[in-house]
Swiss-Prot record:
Enzyme Commission number: 2.7.7.6
Coiled-coil stretches: none
Catalyzed reactions: RNA(n) + a ribonucleoside 5'-triphosphate = RNA(n+1) + diphosphate
Family in the record: Belongs to the RNA polymerase beta' chain family.
Protein name: DNA-directed RNA polymerase subunit beta'
Gene Ontology terms for molecular function: DNA binding; DNA-directed RNA polymerase activity; magnesium ion binding; zinc ion binding
Binding-site residues, Zn(2+) 1: 60, 62, 75, 78
KW Metal-binding (keyword) present: yes
NCBIfam families linked: rpoC_TIGR
Binding site for Zn(2+) 2: 822, 896, 903, 906
HAMAP family linked to this entry: RNApol_bact_RpoC (MF_01322)
């Protein structure tokens, strides 16, 4: 028996008739399924127990042998073997066909493999196979050509002339004879000769034929096996028949399709035995062919066979295809045991690493563990007794349950799982009720809210799984977002508002200027109601024992507020005292200006000092995020998660105390709003007058009106924000970053402004009312356009974004960190990414966390800042940019030489941990999720750049899809294919512009549409591949003109442009990994003396291997050019057929793989999931498969790590 979990590759091929018979346990001769009275399977039928095995465990059909003791006996009465009924899932049967039948995949697929091999058109093949024409197999003396077609009349004519001297056949038999006669070696030789001379259409056909012939020759498949003599029947449990309540039966469609085949086959046998007339036999053979076609792929040819209610029957091919097919439904994702699902509720008192599990759910999930413990503690006598105790929910069960779940992490998952933070591990605590309690800080990562969201719980069972969950997936470990390395667990809403309120200062607060000895005094005074949170006070600096305070500062009084003293309690001791929301205070020291020498104070003391000082800004959401990032950088993850918990508690506590609410009175309408509106109304009238006089065009008028009203809204917004009290609840909410922004407030109290029509064009009639005043009917109607479009957009966007993520994951799933250093000698030159003058991504962000490829010296001091292959940390990156260096070479995934993945050095640091990336990290999947997850935040709209002349710029999600699918973009830019000077720009016919570029050896002219904006002028010198007009470049063309490196950088820049414009930050390395996957194939131009086929797509590594061999043997190498594939195409072109088949176009991929006899080396993640092995990433990598752990004598503390013994 082969070990199911330990094989190295999987191979697929065509099955010979002998092979099919060897799989089979007997021939199915009757179309019957089960007897309607006894409900037992019919003998020799589709469910026959003699062929497929018994329906009941250890019991033969007639009941003579029952029980395990007769294991392996074959009953002498009914012929059924006594064994487990499970064999009915694996035993196959077969049908001996009375006439050969063609397999529809090989005859009908595009391109038709059978047609290419025989050099016949698919049309001709169809005529022969479906008995419309004869094919000449052996022409004899007739002068006919071999493989030519004859109609019935022509065949009669020749048959009368040359009786018995030539052979022409109909149906699959004729094709089978032709296939058997093919000599692959001779075909190969003649085709290789033809390649030398042929051109155009003949050349492409020859290349296609050569590919098929080569496939058959290399794989050892016999071409005649594309014609079936024997049909396999899949095991009955996979096409079950079940009884419904009303005594009727529900059956799998396959049984109907098999039944048709058997009926027709039996009828054909009988007709042949009777020696029926040829025309009747022919008709029956054709019907048999059609029945087999329907079984294999119903609906591929002609009308599909339908069942009751005109529903097409699901054939074998449909069982594999699509979301409901075998691959995606059962192999890539399975339902698992030990899982539960419930609504989530907030758990504000939980620690970062905890979640609350409902008691009933926990009991059911941990049932086996509890049962074992009950028996071990002798609370229950045996397992059965333990089970009944649990079902009765006896009191002693709960104590045991608490011990069982202690330190046994569970996984919580929220659908849709867009990135790896959608599944995290927590330690469960038991809670009453039926809702799962979730820690408020992890909601951002899950994108969860508590309006009825549900989450699933999974229990990791094995010790290894528990260890992985605890070490890698615990929520307290996942503080950084893998897409940009920024903290993802920032406080939000109430927590932000609470901390904002806590750090506010007020001028009129009670007892301002009181000086306290230490923190405890402050807290007591606050508890006793002597001071308010917002009271500005002084505290002796020495009492803080803060290591960042200087000697001089320690002897002074620190001017701060009660709230800030409380806030600073939660921050690690060695941190500076945070007194103002500034980066300097955060990174280094508390500014000197807050330390006051008590001797210098005048008569009014500290109170008088405070009255002169401006109030300090409170801490908003962004600043809280910066604090978290800083603490994370300087301290351990544990410290950070502890501080986060404290920050959360403070936030909730003080937002409750603040009692901030919104009332209608908080929305104050601007008194002089009408004046602003009247003023702008006059401007609009003036523009209309100019238009009526013909001074400006319709476009100019429209743009001017839109601009006037936008300005009006901006002016109202500005004045509103000015007139707002700092303590206005709405202002506090928006200023702190808890909820809302200035624009929302303007709509409530100012004016709603301009709205967009369904087409996306802005309606020039503004909504001058605010929600506080109420809208008129017309205004309300206009504003519904936008609102409804928003909802429709969101729904569409979610589906689109999910599909994009799926394609990205599929193309990059086999990119894993495979080695430490690939030793490449190339690097990527990086600098600022700019669009015109606008900064898209600064240089410093591009180099941080990457490895250098060159030595960088300070231009003035000549001091070495960094050497090659060293990690550029945040400090070094700052040094490099401070030295005025604007570009450098770094290690990049683009230039990595590692096969099937990247190396540690070319990837850089792991953004999710901030540490060096480890071998085994599945960086491809992380990259795909990082790009796909923010997809839902991108817009769907196409921006219209004013008027008729403006071209549409595709942005947001459609643009990302356009880039990754390598499609021709909308609004395409014209690029120059030569280096030279722009000689002339003139008008050509059809209002087009002609740009003439003069190079050293040739002059080329390019046509651009009359409305496109030019980016060059006469006399300007241009590089090869430079853009002449505005717009997006077509990447495939650009690759041919500008080369590989320029194309990679261009695609990277374009992706970053879209995301950064929407305010989404994604690290370059993720885009690099994806773009590299799109460029991993080359197209062979000339094969030289290698075995490669001209015109074929091969992996870049296979190409270099073949050439290396050729060089060794002093032969001519092959030449090739790089090819840019869209992600869908790249996924289908992957080396692994299992991965490609489970993605899209399942039948095409499998047909191709079977003919080529492909082997899948199971290198990616998907292939291993499909066959049920551990994925070759992380601890599942082959290099870690035989690691053993020693058991420590003494308990291991958290800081030590268990020693690993090879």
């Amino acid at each position: 028996m082969i070990d199911v979990n330990n094989f190295h590759y999987m191979k697929i091929g065509l099955a010979s008739p002998e092979k099919i018979r060897s799989w089979s346990y007997g021939e199915v001769k009757k179309p019957e399924t089960i007897n309607y009275r006894t409900l037992k399977p019919e003998k020799d039928g589709l469910f026959c127990e003699r062929i497929f095995g018994p329906t009941k465990d250890w019991e033969c059909s007639c009941g003579k042998y029952k029980r395990v003791r007769y294991k392996g006996m074959v009953c002498d009465r009914c012929g059924v073997e006594v064994t487990k009924s499970k064999v009915r899932r694996e035993r196959m049967g077969h049908i001996e066909l009375a006439a050969p039948v063609s397999h529809i995949w090989y005859f009908k697929g595009i391109p038709s493999r059978m047609g290419l091999l025989l050099d016949m058109s698919p049309r001709a093949l169809e005529e022969v196979i479906y008995f419309a024409s004869y094919v000449v197999v052996d022409p004899g003396p007739t002068g006919l050509e071999k493989k030519s077609l004859l109609s019935e009349a022509e065949f009669r004519e020749y048959y009368d002339k040359y009786p018995g001297q030539f052979v022409a056949k109909m149906g699959a038999e004729g094709i089978k004879d032709l296939l058997e006669e093919i000599n692959l070696d001779e075909e190969l030789k003649s085709l290789r000769d033809e390649l030398e001379s042929a051109t155009g259409q003949r050349l492409t056909r020859a290349i296609k034929r050569l590919e098929v012939v080569e496939s058959f020759r290399n794989s050892g498949n016999n071409p005649a096996w594309m014609i079936l003599d024997v049909l396999p029947i899949i095991p009955p449990e996979i096409r079950p028949m079940v009884q419904l309540d009303g005594g009727r039966f529900a059956t799998s469609d396959l049984n109907d399709l098999y039944r048709r085949v058997i009926n027709r086959n039996n009828r054909l046998k009988r007709l042949l035995d009777l020696g029926a007339p040829g025309i009747i036999v022919q008709n029956e053979k054709r019907m048999l062919q059609e029945a087999v076609d329907a079984l294999i792929d119903n609906g591929r040819r002609g009308r599909p066979v339908t069942g009751p209610g005109n529903r097409p029957l699901k054939s074998l091919s449909h069982m594999l295809k699509g979301k409901q097919g075998r691959f995606r439904q059962n192999l890539l994702g399975k339902r698992v045991d030990y899982s539960g699902r419930s609504v989530i509720a907030v758990g504000p008192s939980l620690k970062m690493y905890q979640c609350g599990l409902p008691k009933e759910m926990a009991l059911e999930l941990f049932k086996p563990f509890v049962m074992k413990e009950l028996v071990q503690r002798e609370i229950a006598t045996n397992i059965k007794n333990a089970k009944s105790k649990i079902e009765r929910m006896d009191d002693e069960v709960w104590d045991v349950l608490e011990d069982v779940i202690r330190e046994h992490p569970v996984l919580l998952n929220r659908a849709p799982t867009l990135h790896r933070l959608g599944i995290q591990a927590f330690e469960p605590t038991l809670v009453e009720g039926r809702a799962i309690r979730l820690h408020p800080l992890v909601t951002t990562a899950y994108n969860a809210d508590f309006d009825g969201d549900q989450m699933a719980v999974h229990v990791p069972l094995s010790k290894e799984a528990q260890a992985e969950a605890r070490m890698l997936m615990l929520a307290a470990q996942n503080i950084l977002n893998p897409k940009d390395g920024k903290p993802v667990v920032t406080p939000s809403q109430d927590m932000v508002l609470g901390n904002y309120y806590l750090t506010l200062e007020r001028k009129d607060a009670m007892n301002t200027g009181t000086i306290f000895n230490d923190t405890n005094e402050v807290l007591k005074a606050y508890a006793n109601g002597y001071v308010h949170l917002h009271t500005r006070i002084g505290v002796h600096a020495k009492s803080f024992n803060n290591p960042t305070f200087t000697e001089a500062q320690n002897n002074k009084i620190l001017a701060t507020s009660v709230g800030k003293v409380i806030f600073n309690e939660i921050i690690p001791d060695s941190f500076a005292f945070i007194n103002e929301p500034s980066q300097t205070n955060l990174e280094g020291k508390t500014p000197d200006k807050y330390f006051i020498d008590s001797t210098q104070l005048g008569e009014g003391g500290l109170k008088a000092y405070f009255e002169e000082q401006e109030l300090i800004e409170p801490f908003n959401k962004k600043f809280l995020g910066n604090i978290i990032a800083e603490v994370f950088n300087r301290f351990s993850i544990t410290d950070t998660s502890m501080m986060l918990d404290r920050m959360k508690d403070l936030g909730f506590k003080f937002s409750s105390k603040a009692g901030i609410t919104v009332g209608v009175a908080d929305i104050v309408v601007l008194p002089d709003k009408q004046d602003i509106l009247d003023e702008h109304e006059k401007l609009v009238e003036r523009v209309s007058k100019q238009f009526n006089r013909g001074l400006i065009t319709e476009d100019e008028r429209y743009n001017a009106v839109v601009e006037i009203w936008t300005d009006a809204k901006d002016q109202i917004q500005g004045e509103l924000m000015q007139s707002l009290e700092k303590t206005n609840p709405i202002f506090m909410m928006s200023d702190s970053g808890a909820r809302g922004n200035a624009s929302n407030f303007t709509q409530l109290a100012g004016m709603r402004g301009l709205m967009a029509a369904p087409s996306g064009k802005i309606i020039e009639l503004p909504i001058t009312s605010s929600f506080r005043e109420g809208l008129t009917v017309l205004e309300y109607f206009i504003s519904t356009h936008g609102a409804r479009k928003g909802l429709a957009d969101t729904a569409l966007k979610t589906a689109d974004s999910g599909y994009l993520t799926r394609r990205l994951v599929d193309v990059a799933q086999d990119v894993i960190v495979r080695e430490e250093d690939c030793g490449t000698d190339r690097g990527l030159l990086v600098s600022d990414i700019k669009e015109g003058t606008e900064m898209i991504e600064p240089f410093i962000e591009r180099i941080e966390g990457r490895y250098s490829k060159e030595t960088i010296r300070h231009p003035e001091t000549d001091e070495i800042i960094i050497r090659p292959d060293e990690l550029i940390t945040a400090e070094i990156a700052k040094k490099i940019t401070d030295a005025g260096i604007e570009q450098m070479y770094i290690r990049s995934a683009f230039t990595c030489n590692t096969r099937h993945g990247v190396c540690e050095k070319c990837y850089g640091k792991n953004l999710a941990t901030g540490e060096k990336v480890e071998v085994g990290e599945a960086v491809g999947t992380i990259a795909a999720q990082s790009i796909g997850e923010p997809g839902t935040q991108l817009t769907m709209r196409t921006f219209h750049t004013g008027g008729v002349a403006g071209s549409d710029i595709t942005q947001g999600l459609p643009r990302i899809q356009e880039i990754f699918e390598a499609r021709n973009p909308k609004g395409q830019a014209v690029i120059t294919e030569i280096e030279g000077v722009v000689e002339d720009i003139k008008l050509a016919k059809d209002r087009q512009q002609e740009i003439v570029v003069k190079g050293a050896n040739e002059t080329r002219s390019y046509l651009a549409s009359g409305t496109s904006r030019l980016k060059v002028e006469v006399g300007q010198s241009v590089e090869r591949g430079e853009v002449l007009t505005e717009g997006s470049i077509e990447p495939k063309n650009f690759l041919a003109v500008a080369g590989l490196n320029a194309t990679e950088s261009y695609l990277l820049k374009e992706v970053q442009k879209v995301y950064r414009m929407q305010g989404v930050e994604i690290d370059d390395k993720h885009v690099e990994v994806m773009v590299r996957q799109m460029l991993r194939k080359v197209r062979i131009i000339e094969a030289g003396d290698t075995k490669l086929l001209p015109g074929s797509l091969v992996d870049i590594h296979s190409f270099t291997d073949a050439n290396r061999e050729a060089f060794k043997e002093r032969k001519r190498p092959a030449t090739a050019k790089p090819v840019l594939l869209g992600i869908t195409k790249a996924s289908l072109e992957t080396e692994s057929f299992l991965s490609a088949a489970s993605f899209q176009e399942t039948t095409r991929v499998l047909t191709d793989a079977a003919i080529k006899g492909k082997r899948d080396d199971l290198l990616g993640l998907k292939e291993n999931v499909i066959i049920g092995k551990l994925i070759p990433a992380g601890t599942g990598m082959r290099r870690y498969s035989d690691v053993k752990y020693d058991k420590a004598e003494t308990p291991v503390t958290e800081t030590e790590e268990a020693e690993i013994i090879e």
